[in-house]
Amino acid sequence: MKLNLNSSDITIEDVNLQVEKSSRYIEGKVQVIITLKNSSKTLIYYVLKRPRNIDYDKGSRTLSIGLYEKELPQDIKVSFSRFEPEQVAILPDTTLQWQYLFPVWMKKITRPSGLREIVEVLNISDVQKVVCTVAYHTSPFRVKSSDGPEEVLVALSKWGETVSASFERKLTL
């Protein structure tokens, strides 16, 4: 069920990248700070707390961060248990920031139809653009006890509306 939400209520105000310079990590880490704003004067919106998909296109040097569930490919079978992803409420007329740590070196696993998985190692230190997509809704996502794992992911992929924004960003090493 799609709602007629006022898409101008939720905006991605900023996505900022910084190199994490802590000595706690052997490999480099990138601190990503996402700023969301709820401009509504009355509505509370719910968003997923953690990214559901991260991708890097080395050709365009674009880092994509998704706080939404993509639709499952037809040939993928899901075998994990049902769960409700962590969600955060953004109160009316409020701006919130989330911080994540991503590795500078990421492994991208793809499985072309009928073939074995391909593992590609990506270095995101030369990023020039960040695209962020966030799903939001006026009600939190809830799992029905009768839903199986695949049904949960399909329902989550159809939950709410999405908003996207892109930002020109570079890492200073």
Residue ranges of each PLM-predicted region?
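A eukaryote-biased signal for short, well-structured alpha-helical docking elements
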Residues: 1-9
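One face of beta-strands
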Residues: 8, 13-15, 61
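Short structured motifs
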Residues: 15-20, 81-86, 114-118
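Short, solvent-exposed loop/linker segments at the N-terminal edge
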Residues: 22-28
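Hydrophobic core residues within well-ordered beta-strands of beta-rich domains
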Residues: 30-32, 96
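Asparagine-centered strand-capping/turn motif at beta-strand->loop junctions
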Residues: 34-43
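The feature marks short-to-medium sequence segments in extracytoplasmic or secretory-pathway proteins
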Residues: 46-95
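Surface-exposed edge beta-strand/loop patches
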Residues: 86, 92-173
